[in-house]
């Protein structure tokens, strides 16, 4: 089983417009609502890839029942921690004239110490059956930056961590198996500009030296890099039609987790994660993956060991 755990789910609105004009009235071609946020996206993606997964998250307000109901319809096993404050609502605007995506992201509401304790209790209960864990998403205001670190300290199996800044730095002490900040998040964590490929790889290997077995940096349609202490890999992504980029990073994490769960070596797991991200890019709703579609993208991805 895979565990997807995180504190920042969202109830997501996806709007399609012919041409977005700021400061004007914009009428939408279509409007969709979906369960989302990193932890939810990972759970949905893993389920679509046919692997058992428990999705652990807090939720409150009107969105709690909506998210729970949709996950049940999708066949996603979940454990929801009741939260006093309402779950955030985020909006994605897809401009079909330019292909650009505009994100209106509400920050997650603070979560109480009692709710965090309940979350950890459920995590530890389900951990007994887990072979891979994905810890993902920003921490709500007031949550200790050590929260992910403390969960990793209790975890006996490989952990994929999608976090940044203080929570990533703290978690490195417990040696997560794989971390996947984006380029900007890595710069923020290291507090330095990574202006070229050489600087980027050196920055990634600093994170390896500080505890992460693998570091993965995706850059959208550009090269993805992966490093361990001994090796550097360059991956050239597949070409895919852009419909909605939301949850591509989460699909990458889910694809890697599923491949590791199936015993694949890390470079191949990353390749399969990239195929999942490419498939997600072509879908309107987040993380609704198909292994059949993914195979086409998998075959296009180029992998080169640099060191």
Describe every region a protein language model picked out.
Residues 1-23, 32:
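Positively charged, low-complexity intrinsically disordered leader regions
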Residues 3, 54, 134, 160-162, ...:
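Structural detector of well-ordered beta-strand residues that form the stable sheet scaffold
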Residues 27-87, 300:
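Substrate-binding N-lobe of the ribokinase-like
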Residues 47, 152, 261:
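Gly/Ala-rich phosphate-binding loop of Rossmann-like dinucleotide-binding domains
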Residues 93-129:
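Conserved phosphate-binding/catalytic loop of the ribokinase/pfkB sugar-kinase fold
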Residues 129-140:
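Short acidic, glycine-rich surface-loop motifs adjacent to enzyme active sites
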Residues 146-230:
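Conserved phosphate/ATP/ADP-binding segment of small-molecule kinases
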Residues 169, 197-307:
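Conserved phosphate-binding/catalytic region of the ribokinase-like
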């Amino acid at each position: 089983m895979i565990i997807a755990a995180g504190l920042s789910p969202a109830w997501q609105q996806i709007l399609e417009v012919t041409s977005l004009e700021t400061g004007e009235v914009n009428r939408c071609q279509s409007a969709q609502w979906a369960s989302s946020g990193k932890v939810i996206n990972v759970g949905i993606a893993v389920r679509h890839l046919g692997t058992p997964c428990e999705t652990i998250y807090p939720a409150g307000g009107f969105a709690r029942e909506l998210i729970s109901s949709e996950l049940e319809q999708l066949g996603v096993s979940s454990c929801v921690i009741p939260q006093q404050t309402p779950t955030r609502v985020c909006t994605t605007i897809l401009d079909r004239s330019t292909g650009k995506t505009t994100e209106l992201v509400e920050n997650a509401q603070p979560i109480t110490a009692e709710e965090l304790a309940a979350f950890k209790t459920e995590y530890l209960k389900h951990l007994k059956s887990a072979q891979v864990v994905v810890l993902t998403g920003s921490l709500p205001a007031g949550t200790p930056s050590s929260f992910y670190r403390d969960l990793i300290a209790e975890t006996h199996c490989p952990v994929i961590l999608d976090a940044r800044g203080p929570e990533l730095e703290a978690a490195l002490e417990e040696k997560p198996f794989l971390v996947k900040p984006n380029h900007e998040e890595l710069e923020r964590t290291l507090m330095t500009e990574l202006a070229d490929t050489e600087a980027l790889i050196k920055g990634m290997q600093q994170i390896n030296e500080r505890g992460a077995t693998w570091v993965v940096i995706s850059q959208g349609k550009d090269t993805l890099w992966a490093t361990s202490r001994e090796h550097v890999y360059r991956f050239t992504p597949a070409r895919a039609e852009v419909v909605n980029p939301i949850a591509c990073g989460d699909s990458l994490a889910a694809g890697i987790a599923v491949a590791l769960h199936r015993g694949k070596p890390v470079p191949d797991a990353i390749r399969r994660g990239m195929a999942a991200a490419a498939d997600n890019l072509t879908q309107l709703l987040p993380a609704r993956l198909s292994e059949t579609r993914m195979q086409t993208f998998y075959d296009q991805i180029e992998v080169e060991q640099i060191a």
